[in-house]
Amino acid sequence: LPCFALDLSLLVEEALSVQSSGFIEAVDKAMSLLRNEDGRVGNLTIVNRLVKLEPLGEALVIGDLHGDFESLIIILQTSGFVEKMEKTKEATLIFLGDYGDRGDKSAEIYYAILKLKLAFPGQVVLLRGNHEAPKDLLGYPHDLPFQFQNRFGEDWKMAYEKTRALFAYLYNAVFVEDRYLMVHGGVSPEIRSLQDIAQAQENRNEALLEDLLWSDPDENVRGISSSPRGAGKLFGKKVTKEVLGKLNAKILIRGHESSDEGFKIDHDGKVLTLFSRKGSPYFNRYGAYLQLPLSEKFENAQQLIQWIHKF
């Protein structure tokens, strides 16, 4: 059973009022939990920075939040997923990365997702986005330091440095055998096995980490081409199909790109993009999340539309 019953309204209240000491404590606890996660944790099997998930029960998958705390609350309230996690171990909450920057409630988002992880260690997975990347790959604008200054006053630096240290312990990907590969950005033709993804954060693999965190699917590219983002690449349909084939997955689920509808489908239904925040600078009409029965098998992201919730 979880360490404690988590009251959502209390969590929201706490996140909005937490002082730097409470924030730092949550980051420290989460970091020590993540650092020591290895092997079997609930329905998760942890292999370095890869999470293998059993095809049991359901998953709630959330895309980029970028400091939009309101959208996170809407998703958790509407889905009733926290209560579900309390009732059954077979409910897994997966975040696809990009928690901070842009929106002005980055600290609140970090606090809330870390408290969720601490309450349900075997049921919450926090992926790494390009806004949680190593220093030389970090997404722009990186306005987290300014937000922390505003939020925490003179203690902001410690809170910020701890949060930056936490980034290294977030996961590169989630894999559900014969079903899904979930990453923040994209895939690369360099991927030969799950092991490559699991150790992509190690120095010699940084080009692969860059692709996982930064790359985008493109309909007009055959293989790969340079990305207008200045990091990562654009990858074509052929790359998607080859990588999914090598790994034994059917659909790539990722975040990283805004979409007016909150989601989009590419590469003949082999790529689903989720975007879960609203507001500037994207002004998308909808945010979306995915609430998915994991035991069912789908070949194509078109079949997942019935499980996508727009708000």
Language-model features, listed with the residues they occupy:
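Feature recognizes metal-dependent phosphohydrolase scaffolds
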Residues: 1-311
